[in-house]
């Protein structure tokens, strides 16, 4: 089975997390799907770069590329962007990349999971302050955010080229401070 992703919980420090939370008010209950590049997005990307550099995962080639292929994505309640593509069954594939969940709270019953096809896991819950590295050529999609959700699914995503495949996170996660 293909390794779908590497997950790192509590990715950013509480100070940085609190700064993010103070900047996402407009996204929490929006009724439309959004992909935005704002000053908050730039700040979060800088923090992600810092953390990935500490973990020896950052690739210098991404510095100029990530601003072009990243955004804050907001998935409101009921939105189903994936299943409208019947040929792929609600999944798509990229050259690898990451998703960092910035919504303030999440309950598993709200859906919105990151889902995978033909991988070692079927889905990953969008837990707040969770960083997920999606390996290259892995079919993935987004589950529908259910009507019981009290806030939207909000994530910072990036899909740079030249990404690496990570088969195990054991050593990487264990070095995270």
Regions found by a protein language model. Name each.
Residues 59-176:
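Catalytic core of non-heme Fe(II) oxygenases with the double-stranded beta-helix
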Residues 1-71:
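Non-heme Fe(II)/2-oxoglutarate
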Residues 1, 176-177:
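Short intrinsically disordered terminal tails
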């Amino acid at each position: 089975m293909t390794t779908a992703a590497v997950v790192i919980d509590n990715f950013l420090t509480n100070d940085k997390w609190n700064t993010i939370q103070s900047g996402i008010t407009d996204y929490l209950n929006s009724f439309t799907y959004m992909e935005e590049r704002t000053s908050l997005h730039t700040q979060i990307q800088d923090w992600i770069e810092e953390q990935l550099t500490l973990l020896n995962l950052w690739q210098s080639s991404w510095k100029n590329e990530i601003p072009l292929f990243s955004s804050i994505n907001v998935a409101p309640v009921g939105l189903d962007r994936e299943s409208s593509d019947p040929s792929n069954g609600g999944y798509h594939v990229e050259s690898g990349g990451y998703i960092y969940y910035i919504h303030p709270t999440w309950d598993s019953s709200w859906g919105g999971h990151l889902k995978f096809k033909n991988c070692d896991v079927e889905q990953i819950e969008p837990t707040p302050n969770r960083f997920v590295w999606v390996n290259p050529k892995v079919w993935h999609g987004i589950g529908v955010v259910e009507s019981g959700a009290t806030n939207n699914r909000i994530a910072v995503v990036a899909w740079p080229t030249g990404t690496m495949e990570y088969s195990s996170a054991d050593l990487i996660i264990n070095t995270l401070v």
